[in-house]
Amino acid sequence: MESKEELRQRIGDLAFEVTQHAATERAFTGQYDDFFEKGIYVDVVSGEVLFSSLDKFNSGCGWPAFSKPIQHRMVTNHHDSSHGMRRVEVKSREAGSHLGHVFNDGPKEAGGLRYCINSAALKFIPYDQMEQEGYAEWLGIFDKS
């Protein structure tokens, strides 16, 4: 099993603080905020599949926003009352990585949710590299679009 220090070395300081200590990257600084290439987003810690570019939208909030995870079972929701706010924290199911928060102000036509996710918690797998990266089983989600 990977130690915390080995994990920090593998994913970097910011990703470690975000995923392991629920830190938040500064708005408009993450690499995936204004990024709309075709592919999937996985947990930077475990590689578990989380979100698709098909469900990503520009919310203007300063962080990547998604209308839903690829499958709802891939994330868990937790009550968060930190910083004097009442929010719903989103974590990856397998690794328990802090990803961000979910809000009820997303596009109505897409279900009304906005998953506001830290770029540092994600790794993007481009569509044309999904097979060689071990995500071939997820290629079919793009056939439906």
UniProtKB/Swiss-Prot annotation:
Active-site residues annotated for this sequence: C116
GO biological-process terms attached to the record: protein repair; response to oxidative stress
Species name: Streptococcus equi subsp. equi (strain 4047)
Keywords: Oxidoreductase
Name of the featured protein: Peptide methionine sulfoxide reductase MsrB
Cysteine pairs bridged by disulfides in the record: none
Matching HAMAP family: MsrB
EC annotation from Swiss-Prot or TrEMBL: 1.8.4.12
Group of enzyme by EC: oxidoreductase
Residue span(s) of domain MsrB: 4-127
Catalytic activity from the UniProt record: L-methionyl-[protein] + [thioredoxin]-disulfide + H2O = L-methionyl-(R)-S-oxide-[protein] + [thioredoxin]-dithiol
GO molecular function: peptide-methionine (R)-S-oxide reductase activity
Family: Belongs to the MsrB Met sulfoxide reductase family.
GO cellular component terms given for this protein: cytoplasm
